[in-house]
């Protein structure tokens, strides 16, 4: 199932791999930035990859923070889909890439890890020197009073509030919806969203939606790590989201080398000292 979400790539070139390894190896304070591509081998699709990305394969569009806060229909669409996809997401396990970076950390092979992912797989693999730039989807937070509960606890509340909803879309014997399946228009109508247990406010997965401000403390940490590092390695990100791109651009403006591993173009290709269009696991196995 995991391979379903991994984009097609070209055959490995041993000389390119050796050169890449040699160049990255000269950086003693390496800042690593990971994106959705590092988790595709765990069965979690990315967004923009040709033929397999969620935004390229389906009619799915990102939900904007302002719409989420203003529109009940938008919140119903967000939570109904999250409810149906949660079992698959919750069961996702770290893959070779996550464990490799955890081992790199233990061996002091890099300075810091910034992930744009919200799947928590780096933490599950044992990473500790990490900033989850866009939050963590394994918990849910009130937008009014900062009350927090686990995503699984909230799933239980969603399940209780919406008896029979899952059975409309998930076939008997099937535990969850395919990650790239779009719900029919209007199917979210009537979906009930439990309120905050503390103040009755709106509950939202503890992730940064499009149009939402990033956590200022995390921004400061990332800026500090860029200043401290002397090179950047990006893994599995197109850097289309501005927050990730700005980190790389910040390092580039300081004349620090940029190394990229991503299947397909990225926003920072022109900045790259060297780029490989290979599967991340194939590269990390050689490093």
Curated annotation (Swiss-Prot):
Cofactors demanded by this protein: Zn(2+)
Catalytic reaction list: N(6)-acetyl-L-lysyl-[protein] + NAD(+) + H2O = 2''-O-acetyl-ADP-D-ribose + nicotinamide + L-lysyl-[protein]
UniProt key word Metal-binding: yes
Similarity comment: family membership: Belongs to the sirtuin family. Class II subfamily.
EC number: 2.3.1.286
Protein name: NAD-dependent protein deacylase sir-2.3
Keywords for this protein: Metal-binding, Mitochondrion, NAD, Transferase, Zinc
Tissue: Ubiquitously expressed with high expression in the pharynx, body wall muscles and gonad. Strong expression in a subset of non-neuronal cells in the head.
Gene name of this polypeptide: sir-2.3
Domain Deacetylase sirtuin-type: 10-287
Top-level taxon of the source organism: Eukaryota
């Amino acid at each position: 199932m995991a391979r379903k979400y991994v984009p097609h790539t070209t055959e490995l070139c041993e000389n390119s791999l050796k050169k890449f390894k040699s160049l990255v190896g000269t950086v003693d304070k390496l800042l690593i930035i990971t994106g959705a591509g590092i988790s595709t081998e765990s069965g979690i699709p990315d967004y923009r990859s040709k033929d397999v990305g969620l935004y390229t394969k389906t009619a799915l569009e990102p939900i904007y923070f302002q719409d989420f806060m203003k529109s009940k229909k938008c919140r119903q669409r967000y939570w109904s889909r999250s409810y149906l996809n949660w079992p698959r997401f919750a069961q996702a396990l770290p893959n070779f890439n996550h464990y490799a970076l955890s081992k790199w950390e233990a061996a002091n092979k890099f300075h810091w890890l910034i992930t744009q992912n919200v799947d928590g797989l780096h933490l599950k693999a044992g990473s500790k020197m990490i900033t989850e730039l866009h939050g963590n989807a394994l918990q849910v937070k009130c937008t009014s009073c900062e009350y927090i509960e686990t995503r699984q606890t909230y799933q239980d509340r969603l399940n209780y509030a919406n008896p029979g909803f899952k059975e409309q879309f998930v076939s008997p014997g099937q535990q969850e919806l395919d990650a790239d399946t779009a719900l029919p228009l209007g199917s979210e109508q009537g979906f009930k969203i439990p309120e905050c247990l503390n103040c009755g406010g709106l509950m939202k997965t503890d992730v940064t939606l499009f149009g939402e401000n990033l956590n200022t403390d995390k921004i400061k940490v990332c800026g500090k790590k860029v200043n401290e590092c002397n090179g950047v390695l990006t893994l599995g990100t197109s850097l289309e989201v501005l927050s990730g791109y700005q980190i790389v651009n910040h390092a580039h403006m300081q004349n620090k080398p940029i190394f990229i591993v991503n299947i397909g173009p990225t926003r920072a290709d022109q900045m790259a000292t060297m780029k490989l269009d290979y599967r991340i696991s194939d590269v990390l196995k050689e490093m």
